[in-house]
């Protein structure tokens, strides 16, 4: 039995309106069930609880509540089939979630519902082919890869004392130092027995290079300036004076990896590699993927800023704002649960009411939706498509890189689980391909 009839379809500037007449039999049955639910605990003098005759109970019902509950029940029943109607499913501009719902007719005999589905706005994207200051996508260089390998070796290195020499680049200086600004000690720039690798650029310009040549027991004063872009607002560009004493000099003694010892350097999840060459092949793939991801993320921040500053949409669909703001709130509640902090306490610590947080989320949601709509529009213009082959290839690549030694059965299960999140994987690939295309235009 068809639960409803699609009576009329009207496309407006911002919405697609569907007029839906609920099947008469379904409407009657739904009212009967809701009547039973509402009267099962009803109390009337002379009858036991729940034993009031239906014909008598109906006279005591709130008719508006009965119709409201019945309407919600049929909406819940028909909504998913309604989303599969060709007029919605075949139109990629229709936003399926959170339609506005109204009633053309609602009484004991008839129920005609109006569903207003938001439409994706039509607009021209900003000039995405000439965004300044984007970084090109560059393959992993040998020196970058060797540095990552060396970092693995360094983790197994041993510190040895070399205090009988003058401090040089790459040495580890053990220092006591006091920083003063305007003649007053700055606690955040003061420490004892601090281990500083010379050349690491961990401190402000001139500090590390100013220590080179010192010997243990030497004292030195450095007059420097905090950089103009220093993170502490009150210290930006200010002169600072450091009194420093060198207490010890250390070096990291490193044994290079080779075929006989490489497994000693690898964590448990990589012990399945049978040769150093085999590990290096895998590790190169891993480091390359991470470098690409960092490049895409850094560029994505700049692309987003450009789009938000240069995009004017005719409107932003309320349904998308609600969808995104709800997602943000769920993520915030999940984070509180992860840290085992009551959500209300987290709000109190942030000095925000729930209403204030939701308003902030709505503002962020508007920006997120705007960015997503522009990226989708560019993907359409550039005819960027993601088919099942690309989705399967992406899933296989993720499993191969993240889980190199899972057995075939577990790999099959992981593939199946990720395939259940097909829409999410598709959105990631589409975003990556679109970001890559924008970078290529702007860096060539």
Curated annotation (Swiss-Prot):
The name this protein carries in UniProt is Trigger factor
Quote the InterPro entries the UniProt record gives. PPIase_dom_sf, PPIase_FKBP_dom, Trig_fac, Trigger_fac_C, Trigger_fac_C_sf, Trigger_fac_ribosome-bd_bac, Trigger_fac_ribosome-bd_sf, Trigger_fact/SurA_dom_sf
Domain observations: Consists of 3 domains; the N-terminus binds the ribosome, the middle domain has PPIase activity, while the C-terminus has intrinsic chaperone activity on its own.
Q: Where in the cell is it found?
A: Cytoplasm
Question: A single GO BP annotation from the record?
Answer: cell division
Q: What does this protein do?
A: Involved in protein export. Acts as a chaperone by maintaining the newly synthesized protein in an open conformation. Functions as a peptidyl-prolyl cis-trans isomerase.
MF terms from GO for this chain are: peptidyl-prolyl cis-trans isomerase activity
What Pfam families does this protein's entry cite?
Answer: FKBP_C, Trigger_C, Trigger_N
Superkingdom classification of source: Bacteria
Q: Which organism's genome codes for this protein?
A: Mycoplasma pneumoniae (strain ATCC 29342 / M129 / Subtype 1) (Mycoplasmoides pneumoniae)
The PPIase FKBP-type domain is annotated at: 170-255
């Amino acid at each position: 039995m068809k639960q409803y009839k699609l009576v009329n379809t009207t496309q407006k500037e911002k919405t697609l309106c569907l007029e839906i007449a609920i099947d008469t039999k379904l409407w009657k049955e739904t009212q009967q069930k809701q009547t039973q639910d509402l009267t099962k605990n009803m109390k009337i003098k002379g009858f036991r609880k729940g034993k009031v005759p239906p014909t008598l109970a109906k006279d005591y019902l709130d008719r508006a509540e009965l119709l409201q509950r019945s309407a919600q029940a049929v909406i819940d029943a028909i909504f998913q089939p309604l989303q599969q109607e060709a007029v919605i499913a075949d139109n990629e501009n229709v936003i399926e979630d959170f339609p506005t719902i109204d009633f053309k007719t609602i009484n004991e005999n008839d129920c005609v519902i109006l569903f207003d589905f938001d439409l994706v706005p039509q607009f021209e994207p900003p000039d995405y082919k000439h965004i300044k200051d984007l970084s090109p996508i560059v393959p992993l260089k040998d020196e970058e890869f060797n540095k990552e390998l060396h970092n693995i070796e360094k983790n197994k290195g041993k510190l040895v004392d070399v205090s009988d020499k003058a401090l040089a680049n790459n040495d580890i200086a053990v220092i006591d130092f006091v920083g003063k600004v305007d003649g007053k000690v700055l606690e955040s720039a003061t420490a004892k027995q601090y281990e500083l690798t010379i050349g690491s650029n961990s401190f402000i310009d001139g500090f590390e290079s100013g220590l080179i040549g010192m010997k243990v027991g030497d004292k030195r004063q450095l007059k420097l300036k905090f950089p103009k872009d220093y993170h502490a607002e009150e210290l930006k560009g200010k002169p600072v004076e450091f009194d420093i004493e060198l207490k010890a000099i250390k070096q990291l003694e490193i044994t290079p990896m080779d075929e006989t010892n490489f497994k000693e350097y690898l964590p448990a999840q990589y012990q399945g590699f049978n040769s150093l060459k085999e590990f290096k092949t895998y590790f190169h793939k891993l480091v390359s993927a991470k470098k690409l991801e960092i490049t895409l993320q850094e560029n994505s921040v700049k692309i987003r800023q450009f789009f938000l500053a240069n995009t004017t949409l005719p409107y932003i669909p309320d349904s998308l704002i609600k969808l995104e703001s709800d997602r943000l709130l769920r993520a915030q509640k999940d984070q509180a649960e992860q840290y085992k902090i009551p959500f209300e306490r987290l709000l109190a610590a942030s000095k925000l009411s729930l209403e204030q947080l939701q308003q902030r989320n709505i503002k962020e949601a508007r920006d997120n939706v705007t960015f997503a709509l522009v990226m989708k529009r560019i993907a359409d213009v550039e005819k960027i498509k993601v088919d099942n082959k690309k989705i399967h290839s992406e899933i296989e690549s993720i499993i191969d890189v993240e889980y190199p030694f899972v057995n075939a059965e577990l790999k099959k299960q992981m593939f199946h689980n990720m395939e259940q999140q097909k829409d999410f994987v598709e959105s990631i690939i589409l975003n990556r391909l679109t970001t890559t295309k924008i970078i290529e235009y702007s860096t060539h």
